[in-house]
C-alpha cells in the first residue's frame, strides 16, 4: 500500500510527464508541418484536409493538456528538481506561446515596458521565496518527493527484472519440463529430429569407435572383433539417440518458458503503469543530468559496440546463441547477411536520431560528440 507521500509524488510526476509529452508533440508538429514556427490554425497546409484536421485536433488536445499541467504544477514548482524544472519550463513556454489573444487595449498595455528589468524582479522573487517561513517545509516536501520517486523507480526496475526471470526459471523447471517429458513419447512433433543433432551424434559415435581402438592399443590388448565392436556401437548409438531426443525438446521448453516470462513482464507493466511513468522521469533525469562529455562517451560506446568495425564478431556470437536457444540451425549465410545489413540500418537510424532529436535537445552534446570522433 502506497504512502501519502508516494501517491503525491506519483501524481506530480504523472502530470509533469503528460504535459511534457504534450509539449514535445507540439514541438514535433511545429517542426514537421510549420517549418519550426508556431502553429497557425488558419494557415492552409499543403497536405490533405483530413491530415490537417488530425494535426489541429492533436494540437488543441496537447495545448489543453499543457495548460492543465501548468496550473497543476505551478503551486508546487519549488518541489521540482533541475531536470523536472526544465520540463516545466518547456510546458510554460508552450502555454505562453499559445495563450488566448487579448483585446487590442490589453495587448497595448502588455507591451508597455516594465518599470524594472525582469531579471531583477526574478531575483527579488527568489529572495522572497527563500525568506518565506514555509520555504523550509516546501524544500523538505520536494526532497521527500524525489526520494519517493527514486525508491519507486528502483522497485519497478527490480520487478521488471526479477519477476520475468523467476517466472521463466520456475515454470521451466516445475511445469514445462515435466509436461514436455511426459508428452514427448506420444507426440513426436515435440521431439522432432534436427539435422545438427544428428550430425553431432554421428561425430560422437565416430569418436567413440576411435577411442575403443586407441584404448586397446595403449593397453596392449588385441583390437576388438567386428562383432564386439558392433555391439558396443549399438549400445552407444542408443544412448546418443536418447540424448538427442532430450535435447530436441529443449527448444520447445525454451520457447514456452520465454512466453511465460513475456506474459509476466507484460503483467508487471500493466499493473504498474503509474510507476513506469515515474521510472521514465527518473531515467530522463539521470540521462539529462550527465555532462556533455559523459553523454558523448556513452553514445560512442554504444555505436562502437553495436555498429562499429569490430561488432561483427559480437553479432555472430549473439545470433548463434539465439539460434541454439530456439533450436534453429546457425546458417552461416544468414548470419553474414544479417551482419552486413542490420548494423548499417541501425547506424542510419542512430544518425537520424542525432540529427532530428539530440541536435535540438542538447546541441552541446552533439558538438562534443563530433570533437571526440575527430570530425570537423
Curated annotation (Swiss-Prot):
Compartments it resides in: Cell inner membrane
Keywords recorded for this protein, A-Z: Cell inner membrane, Cell membrane, Hydrogen ion transport, Ion transport, Membrane, Transmembrane, Transmembrane helix, Transport
Domain of life: Bacteria
GO CC annotation, single: plasma membrane
Pfam families, per the entry: CemA
Topology with respect to the bilayer: Multi-pass membrane protein
Membrane-crossing segments per the record: 150-170, 251-271, 299-319, 334-354
A Gene Ontology molecular function term of the record: proton transmembrane transporter activity
Principal localisation: membrane
HAMAP family reported in the protein's UniProt record: CemA_PxcA
Stated family: Belongs to the CemA family.
Function per UniProt: Required for H(+) efflux immediately after light irradiation to form a rapid H(+) concentration gradient across the thylakoid membranes. Together with PxcL, contributes to transient H(+) uptake following dark to light transition.
Protein name as annotated: Proton extrusion protein PxcA
Species the sequence originates in: Prochlorococcus marinus (strain MIT 9303)
Gene: pxcA
Amino acid at each position: 500500500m502506497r504512502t501519502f507521500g508516494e501517491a503525491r509524488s506519483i501524481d506530480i510526476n504523472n502530470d509533469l510527464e503528460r504535459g511534457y509529452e504534450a509539449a514535445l508533440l507540439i514541438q514535433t508538429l511545429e517542426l514537421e508541418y510549420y517549418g519550426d514556427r508556431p502553429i497557425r490554425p488558419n494557415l492552409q497546409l499543403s497536405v490533405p484536409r483530413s491530415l490537417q484536421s488530425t494535426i489541429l485536433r492533436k494540437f488543441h488536445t496537447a495545448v489543453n493538456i499543457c495548460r492543465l499541467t501548468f496550473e497543476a504544477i505551478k503551486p508546487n514548482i519549488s518541489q521540482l528538481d533541475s531536470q523536472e524544472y526544465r520540463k516545466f519550463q518547456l510546458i510554460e513556454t508552450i502555454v505562453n506561446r499559445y495563450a488566448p489573444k487579448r483585446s487590442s487595449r490589453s495587448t497595448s498595455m502588455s507591451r508597455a515596458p516594465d518599470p524594472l528589468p525582469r531579471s531583477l524582479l526574478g531575483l527579488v522573487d527568489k529572495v522572497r521565496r527563500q525568506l518565506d517561513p514555509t520555504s523550509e517545509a516546501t524544500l523538505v516536501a520536494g526532497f521527500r518527493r524525489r526520494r519517493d520517486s527514486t525508491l519507486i523507480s528502483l522497485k519497478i526496475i527490480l520487478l521488471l527484472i526479477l519477476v520475468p526471470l523467476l517466472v521463466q526459471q520456475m515454470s521451466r523447471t516445475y511445469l514445462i519440463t515435466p509436461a514436455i517429458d511426459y508428452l514427448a513419447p506420444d507426440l513426436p512433433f515435440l521431439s522432432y529430429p534436427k539435422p545438427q543433432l544428428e550430425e553431432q551424434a554421428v561425430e560422437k559415435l565416430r569418436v567413440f569407435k576411435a577411442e575403443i581402438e586407441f584404448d586397446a592399443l595403449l593397453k596392449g590388448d588385441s583390437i576388438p572383433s567386428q562383432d564386439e565392436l558392433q555391439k558396443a556401437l549399438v549400445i552407444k548409438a542408443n544412448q546418443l539417440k536418447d540424448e538427442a531426443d532430450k535435447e530436441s525438446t529443449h527448444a520447445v521448453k525454451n520457447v514456452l518458458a520465454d512466453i511465460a516470462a513475456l506474459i509476466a513482464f507484460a503483467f508487471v507493466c500493466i499493473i504498474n503503469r503509474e510507476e513506469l511513468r515515474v521510472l521514465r522521469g527518473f531515467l530522463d533525469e539521470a540521462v539529462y543530468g550527465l555532462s556533455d562529455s559523459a553523454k558523448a562517451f556513452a553514445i560512442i560506446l554504444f555505436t562502437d559496440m553495436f555498429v562499429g568495425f569490430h561488432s561483427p564478431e559480437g553479432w555472430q556470437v549473439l545470433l548463434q546463441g539465439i539460434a541454439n536457444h530456439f533450436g534453429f540451425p546457425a546458417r552461416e549465410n544468414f548470419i553474414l547477411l544479417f551482419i552486413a545489413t542490420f548494423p548499417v540500418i541501425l547506424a542510419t537510424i542512430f544518425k537520424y536520431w542525432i540529427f532530428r532529436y539530440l541536435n535540438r535537445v542538447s546541441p552541446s552534446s552533439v558538438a562534443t560528440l563530433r570533437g571526440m570522433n575527430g570530425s570537423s
